[in-house]
Each structure stands twice: as C-alpha cells, then as structure tokens.
Amino acid sequence: MATKAKSVGQALEATATKRIRKLFGNIHEAVEMPNLIEVQRESYEQFLRSDPSIGYVSGLEKTLRSVFPIRDFAGTAELDFVHYELEAPKYDVEECRQRGITYAAPMKVTLRLIVFEVDSETDTRSVLDIKEQDVYMGDMPLMTENGTFFVNGTERVIVSQMHRSPGVLFDHDRGKTHSSGKFLFAARVIPYRGSWLDFEFDAKDIVNVRIDRKRKLPVTSLLYALGMTGEEILNHFYDRLVFERAENGWKVPFMVENWRGSKPAFDVVDAKTGEVVFAAGHKISPRLANKAAKDGLDTLLIPTEEIFGRYSAYDLINESTGEIYIEAGDEVSAENLEKLDAAGIDKLVLLDIDHNNTGPWIRNTLKADKAEDRDQALSDIYRVMRPGEPPTRETAEALFAGLFFDPERYDLSAVGRVKLNMRLGLDAEDTVTTLRSEDILAVVKELVNLKDGKGEIDDIDNLGNRRVRSVGELLENQYRVGLLRMERAVKERMSSVDVSTVMPNDLINAKPAVAAVREFFGSSQLSQFMDQTNPLSEVTHKRRVSALGPGGLTRERAGFEVRDVHPTHYGRICPIETPEGPNIGLINSLATFARVNKYGFIETPYRRVVDGKVTNEVVYLSAMEESKHTVAQANADLNPDGSFIDELISAREAGEFLMAPREQITLMDVSPKQLVSVAASLIPFLENDDANRALMGSNMQRQAVPLLRAEAPVVGTGMEETVARDSGAAIAARRGGVIDQVDATRIVIRATDMVEPGKSGVDIYRLQKFQRSNQNTCINQRPLVKVGDVVRAGDIIADGPSTELGELALGKNVLVAFMPWNGYNYEDSILISERIVKDDVFTSIHIEEFEVTARDTRLGPEDITRDIPNVGEEALRNLDEAGIVYIGAEVGPGDILAGKITPKGESPMTPEEKLLRAIFGEKASDVRDTSLRLPPGVSGTVVEVRVFNRHGIDKDERAIAIEREEIERLKQDADDERAILNRATFSSLKDLLVGQATSAVPKGLKKGDIVTEEMLVGLDRADWWKLAVVDDKAQTALEAIKAQYDDAIKRINAKYEDRVEKLQRGDELAPGVLKMVKVFVAVKRKLQPGDKMAGRHGNKGVISRILPVEDMPFLEDGTPVDIVLNPLGVPSRMNVGQILETHLGWASRGLGQQVTRALEEWRDANPDATGGEMPEAVREKLEHVYGAEYVEDIRSRDAEGIIELASNLKVGVPFATPVFDGAKEADVSNMLTLAGLDESGQSDLYDGRTGDKFDRKVTVGYIYMLKLHHLVDDKIHARSIGPYSLVTQQPLGGKAQFGGQRFGEMEVWALQAYGAAYTLQEMLTVKSDDVIGRTKVYEAIVKGDDTFEAGIPESFNVLVKEMRSLGLNVELSSYAEEDPDEGPEALPEAAE
C-alpha cells in the first residue's frame, strides 16, 4: 500500500506540503493520464509543424503540395511550391486580447515560377527561366498554450467533429422497404472527398449501383465500364463445375460443401460403383456428407433432368459456322442439349449455382442489363451523371475515369484505404487513395455473399466506423477550399499576363485562402465561443466531440441509434456527460484516458495480459482492434504477481459483458476512471447515483460560478489537481528554480535547471488580476509561494479562479441537514442560513464590459469629453478631465461611464435659442449627448479602463496615463530581469576570478596581481570585464560568460523596446472609428432567493428563503446548520451518492476537529514554541487520522510542515474517493467511528425558533454545494415604458430588448374564466398595441386621472391589411346611432 501514499504526495511539491488527500482507491493505475487538452494541441501541432527528421509532413504543407504546382492553360508556365515558414506573431496573446485582434503568425511561402518554351512541332518543352520569391500569404491563427484561439480578441475553441469514416459499409434495410419484409442488402463506398458509390439489391434481387445518389444502373454496367466482359464477370463471381456425359446421366465431381444440408429430389448415385449414396427426399446431414467424402466418394452420377435450369459458364460456339449453341449465363434446356448432342459435345462447364448456398444474383443482373459492352455501359453512366447531354465516347471515358480514379477529384484518404483493406481483406498500400477495379469487385462480391447468408453487416454506430476530425484536419480542409479558389484566379492571371516578365508575387492573390481561414474561425459551426465559466467548463469544451456541423448530422435527421450509447464507447466516449435537450447524444465528451490516433479513431489504453498474468505493458487500441480481445475490468482481484485470483472474471468481448475463464483474458482495463469523462470523474460516489442524475451533475459542475474564496471539496475524487493543472487556471512553474520576488501581480523565479545559453535565466509569471472571462465571471490569480521557496518544474505556484492549493474548487463545503422545514424546501427549494450571506460564503464577482466608440460622422467627428450639454455636475462626479470614469468609482444604473457628444444637423433656430447661444456659447445647440451609461440593474465598481486611439489621433490625458503605467510595468520587468542576471553572472564571475593571476587589468591595479574578493568589491562592476587572467582555460570561460551576458542584456533590452514601441504606436481600429473606450465594472453578487444552487449529484434547487442564523435548526453543541434540503428529493431520484457524501463529509469534519483540537492544546501547552520543536501530539494525531499508509509521508516532515498540515485541516480532512473505486459503506462507517460520531451519520437537531428537540434524528453532514450561473439578478426584469415592435406595435419580448411580459392565449382563457372583462380589455388594448389608447392612458396617469377608453388594437389593423392583400376588402362600419335595431350599413360597391 505504500504506492498509495506516494501517488498522493510524490516527492512533495509546493502545494502537497500543505495538504494530503486520504485516498480510498485500491487500484494502481498502470499509465499516467494523458494531458487533458492534448487532443487540441496535438492536432494543431500536426497541422502547422513539419518534422523532416522523421519524415513527417505537416497538414498545411500537404495541402499546399496538393494544389501546387499550378500550370497555365497553354503549358508555358508553372508555379511551384518550395516551402513555407511561419514568422513570429506580431502581438502576443495578452496584447491580442486587449486590442481585440486575432493571435496569428504571418505566413511566408517560397514559390518558384518556371517559364517554358514550347516547341510546337516536336511538342517538347524546354526551361527558359526560373524565378524564386517569398510571397506573403496572409496570417495563420496560432493556438495558445491552453488549446484555444484568439479571434478578434475573443477566446474561441474549435470542437472536434465525429463523422462517418471513409471506407466501405455494408447494411440492409431491416425489411422496411419491401412489403414482403425481406432484407435488401446495400453497400456504400464513402470517400474522404469525391463521389459516393452505392450498391444495392432491389426487390427483384437485381444488384444495382448508384453514383452520387443519382438514378440506379445494373451493377454489371459498372463492371463492363471497368473493361470486363460478360464471361469474365460470371467467372469472377461463381465457381465452375465440369459435367461429363455418361450412359444414363451426367458425371460431376462430389463437392462436400455443396451437399451439406441439402435435400435431393433424386437418388444420388456413386459414378464408380453405381450404388445409391443419398436417397431421394432425405436431408443430407453434414456428418453424412463428410462420411461419404471420407469413404472415397469423388464422382457422382446425376440424372439429365438435373442439369436443366443450370447456367453455362462460357459461350459454346460452332467454330466453323459461328453458330452459337449457348451463351455464357444462359439456362441449359432440353433444346440446347439436343443441339449439343448433335454437335457431339459431351462436356459442359456450368456455373456452380445451387440456389441453396449460392444464388444467381449477378447472373440475373447480367441478363437484365441492357448494356452489352463497355461503350454502351459508359454512355449509360454518362446519361445518368449528366442527363440531357449527348454522350460521345471521349467525354464518357473522361467522365468515368474522373469519377473514381483521378486523385484530384477522388480521395479515399489513408483512413479510407485502411478501412477498405480491413473489411475486404485486401492488401493495397495506404498511399493508394483512389479506387481500383479489384476494390469494386471485392465490394460487390462481399455484398453478394451477404445476400447468400455469409458474413455480417456493419454497425454504423460502432466507433470503428466513426472517426474524429480535430482542429488541424478541419482547418486543412477549409484551407484547401480557399487554395482551390486561389488556383483558379492564378490560372486566369497566368494566361492574361506576359509570364516572362512577372514574379510569383504578381500572380498570387492570397485573399481567397485568407478569407477561407477567417470564415472558418469566425463563423463555422464548430468554432465556438469558449465556455469559460470555470476551469472545468474550459477543459470539457476542448474535449467535446460533436456529430453536428458541416458534413455531419443535423438534429432533425439524427435518430435514436446515433444518439444511443454503444458498447464501443467504453473508455472512449463518456456514456454520462451529454447535454439534455435536442442535442442529447450528438454532443459527447471524450473519456479521461482516451486519445485520437493518426487515423482519427479514438483509442483507449489497456494492460496486456500474458498467460493469465497482468503485465504493466500498456497498449492503446481503437474499437476495431479491441473487438478481437477479451478485456477484464480494472477491478478484477489480482495476486501480488499479477495473476487473477478468481476462476471466472467479469469481462467484455465483442461488445458483450460475460464471465470469462481467466485463461481467455488478453487485456485488462487501466483504471476504473477510463469509462467516464473529466466532469463525471469529479463526482464522488458516482457509482451510487442514477445515470440521469449523474448526467445533470456533470453538466451542472460546468455552470458553477467561481467564488470569492475558493475551497476544495473535503470529499473529492483525486482528479481535482489534474483538472486545475491541465486547464491552465493554476500556474505551473516552467522550470525549477528559486522564488526571487512575489507580489499580487507577478512571480519572478531565478531558474536553476534547464539554463541554456541564449535563453533567459529568469522566468517572470504575470498573474491575471480581475480579468473578465467570456461568461463575465472573474479571472483572478493568487500566488501560493514565498520568496526563497525552491520550486521544481511543474509545481503549482499560483491559484486561479475556482482553484485552491492547486486543486479544482468549484463550490463550498457546507453543513447540510436533510429535513422538511415549514414548506420552504417544497419542490427542491433550498433554505439557507443568513451566515452564508454574511460571511460571503457564496459571493462571486462578475465583470461586465461596456464600450463606447467615437466615430467620424457626416456632420463631423464625435468626441469623448467631459463637456456634455444639459448634464449637471452631480452626474459628472466620477469622470476625469478626459470624460472617462475613474478606476475605483462606485457606479449605479444610469451613471455615465464615458461622456460622448455627437454633432447633430443644423435646424433653423428660434429667437430664444439664438439668445441662449449668444449668452452660453456654442456647445449646447449643435451636439447631442450620446454618453455611455450603465444599463438598469447593474451596479458595481470600475476595475479597469482601456482607451484605444486611431493612428495619428492625439491621445488624451487618460490614454497617456494608462500608457505610462504600462511602460512603467514593462520597465520594472526588464530591470528585475537585469538585476537577477547581474547577480547570477557576477557571482559566477567572482568564483572564476578569485585566486587567478591577471594578465590585463583596469586602471589603478597592477598586472600580474592575484585576484581577491576585496579587490573585486573595490572595483566598479563595469571594470570586472576589463580583467584578463593568465590561465587559458579560465580566460576562455571568462569570455564565454561575457558573450552570454552581453547576449542576454541585448535580448532583454530588445524585448522591452519592442513592447514599448507597440504601446506607443496607435491601435488598429475598425474603419471610421477614431477612439474607443472600454470600461470594466466588477459586480459583487451575494447569494439571494431565486439563485440556483446544486450539489455534484444532480441535486439542484432554487433558494426559497434566507433564514436568520438563530432560527436555523442547530446541533447539540449549538452549531446551526447552513442549509436545509428536502429528504424527499433523494429516493425517487435515486442519487444516493449525495447521502454517502454527506456522511463522509461529516466524518471528515469530525477528524479535522480532532486534529485542530490537538494543535490548539499543543499551542496552549507550549506558548513560547519558536517553531523548531516537533509537536509530537499533533503528529501522532495526524498518523492516527490518516492511517498506516501515510505514516512515512507524515514523519518525513519537519515541525513547520506538521503545523502547516494540521492547520489546513480546520475545514476537514480531505478525502479522495475515485469513481468506481471509492470508499465502500464499511469505509464510511469506519471513518465515522474514527471521528467519534454515530455510525448512522444522524444527529439530534433542535428547532432554532423554539429550542425544542426534533422528534427523530436527522442526517447531517457536509456536502459540496455549487452556485450556478443562473443568477436571479441576471433574470429579474420589469418594464414600465419601452420599445415596441414596428409592425404589430406590441412591446418587444425579453430582458435584452427591455421587453414586456407576454400575455398569451392561455392567460387570456384564465381571465375569461374569472370573468375579469376590464382587466382583459386593458391587457389586449392599452397595455399592448392600441397606439392611440396607450398614449391617452399615459397622459391621463400623468394628470392623476385614471379613466380611459380602449380603442382598436393595431394587430387588428394588421389582420385587415393582410386580408386586403389577399384581395378581400374588409371595411369596418358602425351601427347607425339613431336606430339601434337596424342592421349594419351596406358596404360600399367595391366589397361586392
């Protein structure tokens, strides 16, 4: 068990010293979990970077090579691709985020233009001229370290797509097409790009072929087009039998397989002996047939009538006269036989079709085919593909050759070829990516075999037949489309200019290629705005696999089978995590250990089992490869030597679960976690939850808002650290070293390992402070290290949002009681204690971004200024002299964030206006106030302001101040880097120089002196370099240090100057924009009724009431509970995991309190302990709590380490209970007992209002609760007046449009039912779309009057207009006022 402790605190890294998670898992993982965002990184890396050392060509280069060389139409010039290179990006990620631009690298492509001279007589070409040139071909977006892209300043993720693998698929219609219910088999050859080829049986059992789903043709037409004759076709698909005439019948060889299971209608006689072998009408069993063969039966005698109805294999022709006796494929009949008798032919070669094992399908198709040779077949194919065009032989040839045999137009891809080879047992190289005749024949042969009942159809939903296209491949395909568009333009340009005088640059217009890339990143369905709510949602988004998108499925068309969980998903795709709703099953998540192989298939790792012993050798297998193995589960019991303990092992084979004998096992799972995705693996006791609730649990963790103070779960699964690290939320040290400086905004590390010449010896980590995420949550990083700490590469040095001590921390551990409380937890409502609000337990910070732009309008430029017409000083209190809000200002709804004025058109002035203008100056009249104001419902603190100016526009004071601050920051970084470099360099210089004899010295020293420390201290640093020493070796080292130092200083200065230059340069703003101001407002959101909360087990609810602490139920020792949940939410939903979590959390807290008590007692007993003394009592308590496996780890710590560890256990002792390998019921009981608590996990509770004890014990414990991103503040909304829709004149809907509440059909019924006529009339008229009426109501209310009249709703007018547009003239007429009994007035003539 020592390994168990080790895996928790391996050689203690910076965060592991502060906390140990007690692990309940027993299964040792044989392989490390791959990096969680490897899928994205690997794929893009393969797209961008070639590796000549291993002969790997990047996807980008492949694409360029597939389009180049481009030749002009006359063949006089050729533009060829040599190589490409990506230069350094102009701006780094942070600059792109701030400026709103794309993070990309300029791409230079070296092209070679070759000009030929064509000799028209001999038709040969000779090279006239070769020109090479680098051409700029736009910017290629780069991926950040975290697997995302910055496009126009927003972070996006390219989701991987799952699609049908190229290759061949065999299927049948499940008897749905034909009324008889017989299966119609079909085969489909799917290329990566090019025409689809479908083969199918129809109801008459004829084999047809369709190209690109066009009209069907007999399959033999396709075979004719491949150059086969009728005879060749028949002889390829059928065996031949030779029949020889005997006196009383025909002799035929005895083939065992043809007779097994058949029932002859005649006596079958042995030709040699004349004995009856098989009697007529009796079924021949396989045993009987085999026995006959064994006894030496080799030739049978069958009656002549038995030959009738068989088919000839060849044409039989009279050589001399040319008369055809019988054609290949014709039926043998009595007349034919007579002719053959007359001709003296006594040997017949017939096709081996016995209608039992082999059916006449191809022969029937051949006979039904109207085409008889290649030319007819080709013209039939041409007519189907190009209806309405008359075929000529050449065009038909060219069309057919281009369909499947031209690499330009048809590409199976390496994957397609591999799949084809595997399915059909071929052995073509995977570089052959077009179809061959033998491929087509093999497909038809397999289809016919299926019809004959041999072989199995394929399962489309098997992961062996679906593959993943990741970023690199998706972009490659898109770029190819762009290049092909470019190719057309280049060809036209080549034919219209004089090629001998141009350079490659003049021919290439890279716009189409650049546009294709931009379109892909900007608007493709798979390029998505990153879900950045918390680190887990980021990781999950990057690991998502979607079946939707271009070339994929659509929601409406996807049936149940595609969405369902398939046995091959095991270890590859998570069966739990998928959205609820219309996308269920179409959007999936990769399992934890899964990875995508070079062909795009998802692989999962297994341990090899050799001779019944499990080895530590790990193999990654795709679904196709796995199908041949029997795989044991990860939890199978093993002996210490790796052999299985039990005789029968629970295993999987070909998608079935079975108990297999141990000798049969060939592989074993690596870990129980490999089944589920990252989000599901974070749910403790997942094995005790119902699948539907686990699904909700894993989806809701992604919506947890990062809280003000993160707190890792006391009951975790051990995956928390992995997610925090791989998501990039927590910062890991790039190289080992010593912490040199730390403050809230940056960490400076002096590197001690991987220090190479030409590489800085200093790592500066800038922490993100109060940055806005895509979902408006707050990204804030905090350092975890102190100056002087030694860190190793990979240690966590700073926490990010939702992480604590390098572990994912999405929520809080809170004390929960399961009991009803006065109906406040009815229907999943949640009752919470006021303490939670007061102590900011679930408070989160949200950052909203507001921006305003000053444009150049027709009437003059807009201006951002403090000088706004008709605005009092009170409204301007937060603005500086440039008219922009201060950082730190508290702002509320309607407050001005940036003052802006827009010129308005001149209108003739009244005398009063002229007078005002003369008195008060210009401004007031010709501009209007268009300032940026805070929208309703938002209030908070301004945390950041950014000002962007167009090139050549003077910067205002605010912009200059911001720029100065930024330059100061850069200068500090450069100074620090220099200082550390100086310290390190001069210290190694001192070690080198002291004790050496000098050969050259600066002024004031004597040559030949021995260098001493005092001498160096007295010298100025710059003079140290003037020293030279006698010893050659030392002198060489001295010069090397000098060169390295100069190089490093140069690099630091260059970096600084480059950054400053970028800052001082103007910004690239959209056309017409002169200036842009962005203001970021941080809003503190406390928990309040209406907010949604959830646990990790799908137990979600809305807060119904916040109760004063004194009214909450309390425990025996007076501790009030934090949350009261409804016990009825558990049984029907079957998510029992939450109860086990409650118990274990309760035990954790109990143990934590024991340790805290021991620590306090020790402190009381040793008030003046300096920190060097070992707190023995505390250490013993820790050993007692953690158990034997952790003793070694605890004893290896010093006194300070023990105290730090103990003081971190206040909240509770952290547990890790991995999914499917976690704490059992007994473990939970043991922990409760160890903590000195009741084993039932229940406690006596007292009512906070009366002090009375509740009748029975209540389950109380600690649960990890999350606050979800569904906050009532974002949803609550009210409208008094606001915008109306143009046509219907009804208020708009929704909070974003400041709309009203819809009063729909059903609500109208409700008012009708109550007879509330006046309310109903108001709702349908003056409160909605009676334009005149609502204006009158407004006027009346303003005057204090409350009588009003309803008019005609606008929607009625719309209806009338619509009817008129149909030619029905509808007019309204009123009853005559004098005589109410009279009918309506007659309509005018037009209506008749």
Curated annotation (Swiss-Prot):
GO terms for cellular component: DNA-directed RNA polymerase complex. GO terms for biological process: DNA-templated transcription. GO terms for molecular function: DNA binding; DNA-directed RNA polymerase activity; ribonucleoside binding. Its EC number is 2.7.7.6. Signal peptide: none annotated. It catalyses: RNA(n) + a ribonucleoside 5'-triphosphate = RNA(n+1) + diphosphate. It comes from the Bacteria. CDD domains: RNA_pol_B_RPB2. Keywords: DNA-directed RNA polymerase, Nucleotidyltransferase, Transcription, Transferase. Pfam families: RNA_pol_Rpb2_1, RNA_pol_Rpb2_2, RNA_pol_Rpb2_3, RNA_pol_Rpb2_45, RNA_pol_Rpb2_6, RNA_pol_Rpb2_7. Coiled coil: none annotated. Residues 1372-1392 are annotated as: Disordered. It is an enzyme of class 2 (transferase). Belongs to the RNA polymerase beta chain family. HAMAP family: RNApol_bact_RpoB (MF_01321). DNA-dependent RNA polymerase catalyzes the transcription of DNA into RNA using the four ribonucleoside triphosphates as substrates. The RNAP catalytic core consists of 2 alpha, 1 beta, 1 beta' and 1 omega subunit. When a sigma factor is associated with the core the holoenzyme is formed, which can initiate transcription. This is DNA-directed RNA polymerase subunit beta. The lineage of its organism: Bacteria, Pseudomonadati, Pseudomonadota, Alphaproteobacteria, Sphingomonadales. The gene is rpoB.
